[in-house]
Each structure stands twice: as C-alpha cells, then as structure tokens.
Amino acid sequence: MQLEKMITEGSNTASAEIDRVSTLEMCRIINDEDKTVPPAVDRVLPDIAAAIDVIHAQVSGGGRLIYLGAGTSGRLGILDASECPPTYGVKPGLVVGLIAGGEYAIQHAVEGAEDSREGGVNDLKNINLTAQDVVVGIAASGRTPYVIAGLEYARQLGCRTVGISCNPGSAVSTTAEFAITPIVGAEVVTGSSRMKAGTAQKLVLNMLSTGLMIKSGKVFGNLMVDVVATNEKLHVRQVNIVKNATGCNAEQAEAALIACERNCKTAIVMVLKNLDAAEAKKRLDQHGGFIRQVLDKE
C-alpha cells in the first residue's frame, strides 16, 4: 500500500485552517475529530471480541499475550502490558510489550527501527516465543516492516496472531489471522497518527487486556479483585473492594485482608462464606480462582 493512498496520511478538511483560528476553536476542532474515534471502534467490536476469545484460550493454556509495535503503537502496547501486574496481580511476563528499537525507543525516536524486519523477528526470538503465545501487531499505517515481519514469524511458529491498524486492507491486517481495523479517517495534523489512530489503538488494547482479565476471573462484578496493594491508595482500594463485594464494614474488611495476607479474593470468600483464610483459599483454588464459581456452586 502506497503511503500517499493511506487514510491515515490523508488531509483533513475540518482542520485545513487550524493554524489561523483561536486557541478555543483549535481545541474544538481537535475534540470534534476525537469524537469520531469511539464510533469507529464500535464498528469493529465483533473483531475485538473474537480476538479476546482467542487470547483467553491461549493464555489459559499457558501462553502469553505479546504486543509488537513501533513508535506510538509500541509505546501503547508497553503501557497496556505494564498496567496488568499491579491491576490484576498477574506475573510481569504474562503480557509483554515490545517496541522497535528497544527500551531506548520508549522515550526517543530510533531512526530506522520500524523499518527493520530483522528487528521484529529477533525481538520475538529474544523472549522465546512459542506456539502457545498470541502476538498482537500494532501499526496505525498497517505497513510497518518491524510488525509485519514479527507477525509472519509468529505464524510460522504456529502462534495465533492479531493485527491492529487504521487502514483497511493493510499488510498488517492481511498478515495476521485476526484483523482489528478501526477506520478513524485523516488526522487533524496530517499524518500524526499518535492522535485519532493512537486513541483508537488505546481503546482496543484496553478491551483486549481487560477482556482477558475478566474472562480469567480477575474481576468480580466490576471489581479488580486481584489488585496488588503497592501503595496507600491501593491499600484503601482493597478495603473498599471487600466492602463493596460483601457489604461488610471497613474494620471487617481490613481484618479479613490481614488474615489472608491482603488477597482480596480470599478475603471476599472468607466474609461471604464465613470461612477462615485457609479454607477460603482452598475453595478458590478448587474453582480456578473464580469467586463467582465458589459462590454459585457451593
């Protein structure tokens, strides 16, 4: 696909005079364009749901979720991956973010990194990619060689693959087994795909990881019941989670959390089933960590 023919490289008529308007009008133009992103994501919800089901199946079988991208796309993958351990209590290696150019590229532009097909393959080899893993290639343009080569390598190994881009029929979309393609149109600043395209990608990644965690029993109701309390704010959140899930008061919630070494799931089952910490943990283990199953089946 030629660069000049890509939707993400097109000229946006709504912002053609943006350098001549007031600051407030400038903000209105940008905000109006941003409003078009959620509907674009809405149109690809079936594709996102299909990807979540595949990711969950692979992760349940011992695989990992691997994000692969360059520039803004790579940074968004790293952002999503880095939030999973504290929010859902998973091991840091379960969701992995890889960026063309390595860690230095998180804060700096690395010239030519996104054009390196070898880089995409080597980065996946360096994390010992296996057929159990799912590789999600992220590229607004859909033409990034680093991502395309990584997806090709992943498929050769037998991995399930997902391609996220904002141009229909792109190489990323056709290379991956599953394509998620929110069409957000031309950017306010021509070609600046960190804007609408980046926002769309962030929304999609939010759904992929959150959907995976919900289906993995990391959410009860709408509560993040595997949250790790790494600071005072999260200690308070744990207490509130147990309170909201059980109807107990703060003192009872804190006592239960202390008794089970601050594991929200165990504390919730302790309170709701009137069990000690050891028995509550045992029942959770018997049901794969799903609070709902403990409550519904016992």
Swiss-Prot record:
Name by which UniProt lists this protein: N-acetylmuramic acid 6-phosphate etherase
Source species: Shigella flexneri
NCBIfam families according to UniProt: N-acetylmuramic acid 6-phosphate etherase, PRK05441.1, PRK12570.1
GO BP terms: 1,6-anhydro-N-acetyl-beta-muramic acid catabolic process; amino sugar catabolic process; N-acetylmuramic acid catabolic process; peptidoglycan turnover
SUPFAM superfamilies, A to Z: SIS domain
EC number(s) on file: 4.2.1.126
GO terms for MF: carbohydrate derivative binding; carbon-oxygen lyase activity; ether hydrolase activity
Catalysis performed (reactions): N-acetyl-D-muramate 6-phosphate + H2O = N-acetyl-D-glucosamine 6-phosphate + (R)-lactate
Pfam family for this entry, one: GKRP_SIS_N
